[in-house]
Swiss-Prot record:
Its main location: cytoplasm. The keyword Cell division does not apply. Belongs to the metallo-dependent hydrolases superfamily. TatD-type hydrolase family. Has both endo- and exonuclease activities. Incises double-stranded DNA without obvious specificity via its endonuclease activity and excises the DNA from the 3'-to 5'-end by its exonuclease activity. May have a role in apoptosis. It is found in: Cytoplasm; Nucleus. One of its GO terms (biological process) is DNA catabolic process. Keywords: Cytoplasm, Hydrolase, Metal-binding, Nuclease, Nucleus. A divalent metal cation 2 binds at residues 124, 161, 187. Its EC number is 3.1.21.-. One of its GO terms (cellular component) is cytosol. This is Deoxyribonuclease Tat-D. Its cofactor is a divalent metal cation. It comes from Schizosaccharomyces pombe (strain 972 / ATCC 24843). Pfam families: TatD_DNase (PF01026).
Length: 312
């Protein structure tokens, strides 16, 4: 792998700010069934081979955030987040000891993780009005605001989720941003140019992954994001760049790894349909083409952005 890195990426370095590393598919488990051997460490090796030096593991509830922190503690290349995803907002109401106790546990975990140096952002949290069947809007809004209060007390930058909820999202968020010097990032951004500019005006970074590169309209938004306010991510195992995506036409490089179906697993192969952090390189190559700059220039600026937001 070291020789691949030397030949393939030279001086490039990337920080995948959205890796759902606690998902069982990274252990070979799909829909609760083991389909192939655990290849977790191979995924990390592939990422490092193409210059992905850091990966932030995202948490989406208390239990999952604790698992993310445990992983981050055991791997130097990992950092993590603590938070409750809007689609899991019902966790607060379903908790056997009540929502207040769930918030207490969330804050304690965030403080513990921050003290260890491994938890570098609060989230993933926000609003998702595309999937109200998981949690109604009133519950999402209530616990978006309650979590913002926790984030202010803990003083962590925000790792935010916003889907089809722009006005409510900013109405709640802007009450707390003045108390958060580093602000945060709206990850997996798929909104309009106007919404993107609203993020920038609020001091937020914008996270770009394969889902940000699906349509021509998406590409116009990515072109318009100021480079100094952009971060890159995969949101693996989801949001891979597919041949049907508008951004796919800008790809020039094939990563130096074989791929296989999960049912025909081979050691060292990427699993088809399972996104992973090494594909940060793919996202970066498309964005560099859209921006008409070199991959080296893009890599260095995005790395600087990532460190500015996610380090002490």
């Amino acid at each position: 792998m070291a020789s691949i890195r030397q030949a393939f990426v030279k001086s490039l370095r990337f920080y995948d700010i959205g890796y759902n590393a606690t998902d069982p598919v990274f252990r070979g488990i799909y829909h609760e069934k083991l389909k192939h051997p655990d290849d977790f460490d191979s995924i990390i090796s592939r990422a490092k081979a193409v210059g992905v030096e850091k990966m932030m593991i995202t948490g989406d509830n208390v239990e999952n955030s604790e698992e993310a922190l445990n992983l981050a503690t055991n791997y130097e290349c990992f950092t993590s987040t603590v938070g409750v995803h809007p689609c899991q907002a019902q966790c607060f109401l379903r908790h056997s000891e009540g929502p207040e106790d769930y918030l207490v546990k969330l804050e304690a975990l965030a403080n513990k993780g921050k003290a260890s140096g491994k938890v570098v952002a609060f989230g993933e949290f926000g609003l998702d009005y595309d999937r109200l069947h998981y949690a109604p809007a009133d519950v999402q809004k209530m616990y978006f605001e309650e979590q913002l209060k926790v984030a202010v007390r803990v003083q962590l930058p925000l790792f935010l989720h916003s889907r089809n909820a722009e006005n409510d999202f900013f109405a709640i968020l802007e009450k707390y941003l003045p108390e958060l010097p580093k602000k945060g990032v709206v990850h997996s951004f798929t909104g309009s140019i106007d919404e993107m500019r609203r993020c920038i005006e609020h001091g937020l970074y914008v996270g770009v992954n394969g889902c940000s590169l699906k349509t021509e309209e998406n590409l116009e938004v990515v072109r318009a994001i100021p480079l100094e306010k952009m971060l890159l991510e995969t949101d693996a195992p989801w949001c891979e760049v597919r041949p049907s995506h508008a951004g796919h036409q800008f790809l020039k490089t094939k990563l130096p790894f074989d791929s296989c179906k999960k049912e025909r697993f081979k050691e060292g192969c990427m699993i088809r349909g399972r996104n992973e952090p090494c594909n940060t390189y793919i996202v970066a190559e498309i964005v560099a083409a859209l921006k008409d700059i070199s991959l080296e220039e893009l890599s260095e600026q995005i790395w600087e952005n990532s460190i500015n937001l996610l380090s002490k």
